[in-house]
Amino acid sequence: MTRPTLADLVAAQERLAGIARVTPVLSSGTIAGFVGRAVLLKAENLQLTGSFKIRGAYNTIAQLTDSERQAGVVTASAGNHGQAVAWAARQAGIAATIFVPEGAPMTKVDAARGYGATVTLGGEGFDEAVAAARLHVETTGATFVHAFDDPRVIAGQGTMGLELAEQLPPGPGTVVIPVGGGGLASGIAIGLRALRPELSLVGVQAAACAPFAGRAPVGPTIADGIAVKYPAELTSAILRDLLDEVVVVDDEAISQALVLLLERSKLVVEGAGAAPVAALLQGLVPGSDPVCAVLAGGNIDATTLVSVTRFGLTSSGRYLVVAIMIPDRPGQLARIVDAVAAQRANVLSVTHHREGRNIGVLETEAELTLETRDEEHSQALIAALAAEGFAVRRLT
């Protein structure tokens, strides 16, 4: 398979003109304050269909022959790529079939259907969905649009690199790119190495699935958009040649970055989109030159957003859950609440447990969920409760 060239990226940019948005690069004073350098955010979460995937999908579909267009397109995806293929196929007036694994997020399934695609369950996992899509190709002659292992897809994603070459300030700097299958990072790297060779390029992967960092997959991650176990030979070769480094962040760091972007930058991003910011906050991208984090997508459903936000607040010490054993008589809970109020913390919920192996007949265990400013505030609150004579057991 031939590696895309700068000319391929320029041709893709011409095809995407008036189709894909030229997403903005935003300055973040808040994140800059944390990392001690100028921070820019490539807000691709504001792209059509909510992610960069529309670039590669449309560039591929726009190059189909008449006979290929008549047979339609097919892909396997549980998320952003499926939506992008569905949208691009609708724009081209051709049929699209998306095979999804069981348990795929319903918001993303519904979005693909809303763009006019036929969505079909393709088995328990992603591999089964791919197998079903390949079988569909054999029986119908449809064109399989791969999420990353296709030069046309890589060239389309690379149009973001052409935009960054113009949008970033002159001189040295660093671009941090989420890496899953490697299509986005490969495309950006091809463009920036040709046009802005002075820039450093850093890839970031989720700790649970980081093959480019030499780690075996160990389980699910909130950054499902970059949870690719087996990258392609083409993208692997490109990234080995063109990336300066690949760093790894865990779900705790990703969730904290997601919350920060939501609260301070007013940007809704998915886990994969928050990974570059997580790498910055964790100090994994040292330097003093300006740094740009690519926010690759913003497709996160409300239920997941609530869960990830709560996880991020808890991991940063802003949600504190404690259990306190108290005598089962009036006024004891009020003492706890008064101590919490004196520390300027907020009580979110209280649960009483009167049954349990370690709970005496005349005792009750009060479990409190508290809102605090940060980890330091949480520790000060626990110390204040202990000073009031309470035996505090921290649960988060």
Predicted regions and their residues:
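PLP-dependent amino-acid enzyme catalytic core
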Residues: 1-396
